[in-house]
């Protein structure tokens, strides 16, 4: 056993580096005469940046297997005006990696209270209560490592220049974060990047590159984030509230040209309560699942540098960026994979929109023969529009599509997509960008195979619901090169069948009639089918329904089996008959 103190030179260096004044320190050591055991306890009393007395104890234990255990307890620490810690406990384990060289194996930290400023605290002043942090490293195959990070906090508050009081700050309760990265190359060092984040020297470009590395510089990435509540006030009044939300993100990154992505989001409830009653809304039971299989993430990442340039650029360039066009062409040529997007919502309430038990899906698949399949579904138990006086019930949409010559269509539509459109506007000349937008649908070669819409249409408030059915099938070929028209091309072929229950127009329920008389929707629907109580010639009566069948062929349009010329002649005959029936004028 031996007792010693830190050297004066080291004390001066610590005082300068940590903004502290060390008043007293003692080192108590226990060691084995044969040198296979050493334990040191360091006790330090110091005054921090705020001149507050603090106590620090550090236990250093050299184990027989050459590993090192480090335990520390800190009463508190005010590093500067923006960084403050209270009641910190920590444990760490170091493993030997060479002669007198050690690498971090694991670390655990807890803090009763912590106040941290990121980016100099301008807009990211963060407060934690009862926070925990865990990090461990395990050796993987060859020079790769497996990293695991856990973080939790009972309370997290975010302040900025406009949210200086606790009542005005965004608050999250019950925050839990888990990140696992398997197969991280040994050359990747996140420490230096996070150090830039803490001292405010991390630029937007550095931040984007850091996130890209965290998500993709590994063989597999698994993460989850959950929170019990989030509250964001406005003008010291409740404004935004989120309850019991969680998300998961899993990435299989072994081959970024054929990556798998799995994303899940669940929200128990979320609402926004602005002062304007018409803008208040609340949603419950929200779920989103996104799966991407064999997706070319590498080609998506190739646009990151262009995105960073877009942030700085404000005007269209004088000439097209060839590197950007090459990246676009490569993206189109190698586009592949399957996607499956599913979303569900138990309820949604807003002044003029009420939804009950809504779900939707969108499945896509690229095929080897330059085809692209897509299948969209939508269902809702109820969708109500109070101001218009109507309600959809048992809504079901089923829409399968097939796109031929999909690569040409992807290239033509590239600049019309929201994300890629922003890139096009800053890396292509205005003339080139406008050309892409104008011709965005010219390469579409689409097959619609019996898309259907079924619903029961009711008034709001509810009275009686009656069925509506729509069936669509068709072919939309590519527009000929010599067609400069912006209109729908003439070579479209297909069928459009609409079936409406007669009772939508003939129901004599007094409550329903009163609602319909004061609804622009019902008035329009009535005028769409009938005029002065007489059925429009585009509809025919079949049993309990009014039906309209529209067929487009290479020879033109047929409506309920009749040509447009037949309908025109019929209209002229009816007009002539009406003129004959008018009483003669008298003097």
Sequence positions of predicted segments:
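Glycine-rich, small/hydroxylated-residue low-complexity segments
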Residues: 3-587
């Amino acid at each position: 056993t031996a007792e010693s103190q830190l050297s004066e030179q080291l004390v001066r260096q610590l005082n300068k580096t940590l903004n502290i004044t060390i008043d007293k320190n003692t080192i108590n050591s226990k060691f084995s005469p044969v040198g296979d055991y050493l334990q040191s306890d360091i006790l330090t009393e110091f005054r921090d940046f705020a001149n507050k007395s603090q106590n620090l104890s550090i236990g250093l234990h050299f184990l027989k297997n050459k590993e090192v255990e480090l335990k520390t307890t800190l009463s508190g620490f005010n590093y500067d005006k923006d960084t403050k810690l209270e009641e910190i406990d920590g444990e760490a384990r170091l493993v030997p990696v060479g002669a007198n060289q050690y690498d971090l194996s694991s670390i655990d930290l807890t803090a009763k209270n912590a106040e941290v400023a990121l980016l100099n605290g301008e807009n990211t002043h963060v407060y934690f209560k009862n926070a925990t942090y865990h990090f461990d490293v395990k050796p993987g195959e060859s020079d790769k490592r497996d990293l695991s990070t856990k973080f939790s906090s009972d309370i997290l508050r975010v302040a900025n220049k406009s949210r200086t009081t606790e009542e005005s700050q965004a608050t999250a309760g019950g925050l839990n974060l888990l990140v696992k990265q398997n197969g991280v190359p040994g050359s990747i060092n996140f420490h230096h990047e996070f150090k830039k984040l803490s001292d405010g020297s991390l630029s937007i470009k550095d931040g984007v590159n850091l996130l890209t590395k965290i998500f993709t510089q590994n063989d597999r990435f698994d993460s989850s984030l959950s929170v019990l509540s989030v509250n964001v006030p406005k003008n010291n009044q409740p404004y935004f509230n989120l309850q019991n939300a969680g998300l998961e993100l899993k990435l299989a990154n072994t081959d970024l040209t054929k990556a798998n992505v799995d994303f899940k989001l669940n929200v128990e409830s979320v609402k926004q309560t602005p002062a304007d009653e018409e803008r208040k809304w609340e949603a419950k039971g929200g779920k989103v699942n996104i799966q991407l299989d064999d997706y070319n993430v590498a080609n998506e990442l190739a646009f990151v540098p262009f995105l960073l340039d877009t942030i700085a650029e404000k005007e269209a360039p004088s000439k097209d960026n060839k590197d950007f066009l090459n990246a676009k062409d490569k993206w189109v040529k190698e586009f592949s994979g399957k996607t499956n997007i599913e979303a569900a919502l138990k309820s949604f309430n807003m002044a003029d929109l009420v939804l009950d038990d809504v779900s939707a899906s969108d499945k896509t698949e690229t095929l080897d023969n330059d085809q692209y399949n897509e299948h969209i579904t939508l269902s809702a138990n109820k969708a109500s529009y109070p101001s218009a006086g109507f309600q959809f019930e048992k809504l079901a949409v089923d829409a399968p599509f097939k796109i031929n010559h999909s690569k040409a269509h992807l290239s033509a539509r590239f600049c019309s997509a929201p994300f890629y459109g922003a890139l096009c506007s800053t890396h292509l000349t205005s003339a080139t960008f406008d050309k892409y937008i104008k011709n965005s649908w010219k390469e579409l070669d689409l097959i619609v195979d019996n898309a259907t819409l079924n619903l029961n249409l009711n008034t709001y408030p509810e009275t009686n619901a009656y069925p509506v059915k729509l069936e669509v099938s068709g072919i939309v070929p590519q527009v000929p090169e010599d067609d400069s028209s912006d209109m729908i091309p003439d070579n479209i072929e297909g069928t459009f069948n609409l079936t409406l229950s007669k009772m939508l127009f003939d129901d004599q329920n007094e409550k329903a009639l009163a609602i319909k008389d004061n609804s622009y929707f019902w008035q329009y629907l009535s005028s769409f089918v009938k005029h002065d109580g007489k059925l429009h010639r585009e509809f025919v009566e079949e049993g309990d329904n009014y039906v309209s069948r529209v067929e487009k062929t290479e020879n033109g349009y047929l409506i309920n089996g009749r040509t447009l010329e037949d309908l025109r002649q019929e209209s002229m005959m009816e007009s002539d008959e009406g003129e004959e029936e008018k009483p003669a004028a008298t003097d």
